[in-house]
Each structure stands twice: as C-alpha cells, then as structure tokens.
C-alpha cells in the first residue's frame, strides 16, 4: 500500500510546488524616498519590471509592480513620470500607462484610451502629456481623473518630453533623425512654435526655465540651451555619439561611447571627461543614465536578454554600488 501511495504523494507535491510558482502574493510596500528604475524587458515577452533603490543606496527591491499588484507590468517599460502622488509607468508594447500610488505602488488606474505605442510622458498643470512612437501628436490626459482630454498635432512623431512654466517641449523622434523641437503651449495645449536644430536630436533635459537639447551626427555632438524659442547658448562638443543628457544641480552630464562627461550649463567651457564605465559596447553599458545628488547612475543592459546591472559611481569614477535588476534597465527617476 505504501509503495502505491508514495508516488501519488510525490506527484501531488511536485504538482503543488510547480503551481505555487505561478501564484503571486501581493506585498505591502512603503516607499518614501529613493529612486525608481524602469527595466524595459524583451520585446513581445511581457517581462518589463520596475526596481527601487532606497535613498541611501543601501537596498534594492526588484519587481515592485508585481509585488504590489500580483500581476506582471507588461511588455516594454519605456519610461515613467513621477509626481507627488502618482507614478505613471509607460508600457510601450502593451499600449498602456499604469498609474500607481507612489508610496505603495498599488495600481490606481490603467490608461489605454488613444494609446498607440506610447513612449515618454511629462506632467504639467495637472495634465499628463504623452508622446507616441508612430503618430505625429502628443496626447493629453487629466493627471487626476486620467481621462483623455485632447490630441495636440505635431509635424513629426516625438520622443522625449520636458516642460517648463510656458511650454511642453517635444523632441522629434530620435531614431528617424529628427531635428525639430516642437513647443506646446501649456495653457492652450496647442503646438505654437518650432525650433529647428542642426542634427538629429538625441537628448533633452530641463533646468528651471532653460531646456537643453543634445544633437549629434557621425562626427560631432552639440548642446543647445533654449529659453522659449530662443537659442540662448550652444556648444560643439567635438565628440561623436553624445547621448544621455542629464542635469544635476549646477551641472550637465552626458555620455559619449563609454565615457561620462560634465559641462557647465552656461556652455561657455569645454566638457570635462570624468571617467569611463569600462570597455565594450557603450550603448549597452549606458543604456540607462541619470545623475542625482552627485551620484551617477548607469544601466548596463548587457546582452539585452539576461538581467541587467545598475552601477552607481561618484564623479571621480569610484564605485558606490552595483545591483542586479531586470532586463535592460533604461531609466532612473527620483522618488
């Protein structure tokens, strides 16, 4: 009798264990500070995730959306926008924007209306602005009710979005060689002005009322300072493949291949090379990049199939922390 029962019990045990792996227990998160990381995942694989590093950089929590909600985030976490109350996670290939409580990361709402491969988002004046990969428009939603408000027509599809008190700046699609920054009046939500630059736009950031735009071609990279529609300053970096333009305090940062650079926002001085993140594919090694409080965050996507690394440096290139996160870490956002 025992010889008959034991295989049955063993089989039941194995079946139970394998099923329990598919069950996801929701956890109560209590996030009050730190940094969010969007892990893109693999295209068509539904394995995008979000990670969180605490404020003193001592602890990492992976897959916080799944932990908080008992379900996966979706397919390709492209970017996010963070407000005092909510985090808007743009999930490109799922055609969703997951709205979550900033503290608990519990899902509040899933925006789907009008979305067609959403890319980047910014919140201004109580409105959420969203760019689309293939459509020459920016979508506008109410940032509290999440209702669709309107579509703002552009000349070309846009990528990154930033905002100051006057405009939302929409940079033309980087991958199609766009050279146009289109300005949306934040009061009227109309495309009122355009600024044409000299090369393909490959970076966009804002500090106060000044918007900084990086462009590049095969041989040179440039940074422009825009105040409204006026180009107030520009510099030729004399470097190829400038990317990842970021601002922290009184400095601008960017990457070129595997090197990290710093430059004064006046753009009156030359860029200072800080350090190299290593040898190899600079695009993968700095797939994600941002700077907070003097700490330089890099997202190493590796082979874009296995889990990636977040490597945090000081300006002198000394290592602060290294963490294993999700697949293809592509962005860092302050709590």
Give the location of each predicted region.
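Bacterial Sec-dependent N-terminal signal peptides
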Residues: 1-35
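Conserved beta-strand positions in repeat-built beta-propeller and related beta-rich domains
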Residues: 35-45, 89-93, 130-134, 170-176, ...
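Structural motif
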Residues: 44-51, 96-99, 137-139, 176-183, ...
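Short loop/turn segments that connect beta-strands within beta-propeller blades
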Residues: 55-56, 101-105, 142-146, 185-189, ...
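Surface loop/turn motifs at the tips and blade-to-blade linkers of beta-strand repeat domains
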Residues: 64-73, 110-115, 151-155, 194-199, ...
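Repeated scaffold domains used in trafficking and secretory/extracellular systems
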Residues: 74-79, 116-123, 156-165, 199-208, ...
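Solenoidal tandem-repeat scaffolds enriched in leucines and small polar residues
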Residues: 148-235
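Intrinsically disordered, low-complexity segments enriched in Gly and acidic/Ser/Thr residues
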Residues: 233-305
């Amino acid at each position: 009798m025992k010889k008959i029962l034991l295989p049955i019990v063993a089989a039941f045990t194995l079946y139970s264990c394998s099923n329990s792996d598919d069950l996801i227990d929701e956890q109560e998160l209590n996030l009050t500070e730190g940094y969010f990381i969007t892990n893109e995942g693999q295209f068509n694989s539904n394995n995008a995730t979000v990670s969180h590093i605490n404020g003193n950089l001592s602890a990492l929590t992976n897959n916080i959306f799944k932990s908080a909600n008992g379900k996966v985030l979706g397919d390709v976490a492209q970017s996010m926008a963070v407000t005092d109350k909510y985090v808007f996670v743009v999930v490109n290939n799922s055609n969703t924007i997951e709205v979550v409580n900033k503290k608990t990361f519990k899902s509040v709402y899933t925006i789907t209306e009008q979305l067609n491969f959403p890319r980047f988002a910014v919140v201004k004046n109580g409105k959420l602005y969203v760019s689309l990969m293939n459509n020459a428009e920016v979508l506008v939603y109410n940032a509290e009710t999440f209702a669709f408000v309107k579509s703002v027509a552009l000349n070309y599809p846009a990528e990154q979005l930033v905002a100051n008190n006057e405009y939302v700046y929409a940079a033309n699609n980087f991958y199609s060689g766009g050279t146009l920054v289109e300005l949306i009046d934040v009061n009227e939500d109309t495309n009122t002005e355009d600024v044409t630059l000299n090369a393909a736009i490959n970076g966009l950031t804002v500090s106060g009322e000044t918007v900084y735009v990086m462009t590049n071609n095969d041989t040179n990279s440039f940074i422009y300072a825009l105040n409204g529609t006026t180009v107030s300053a520009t510099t030729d970096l004399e470097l190829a493949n400038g990317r990842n333009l970021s601002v922290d305090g009184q400095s601008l940062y960017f990457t070129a291949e595997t090197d990290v650079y710093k430059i004064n926002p006046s753009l009156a001085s030359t860029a200072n090379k800080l350090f190299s993140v290593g040898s190899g594919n600079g695009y993968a090694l700095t797939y994600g990049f941002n700077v907070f409080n003097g700490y330089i965050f890099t997202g190493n996507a590796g082979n874009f199939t296995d889990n990636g690394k977040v490597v945090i440096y000081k300006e002198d290139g000394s290592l602060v922390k290294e963490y294993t996160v999700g697949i293809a870490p592509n962005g860092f956002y302050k709590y």
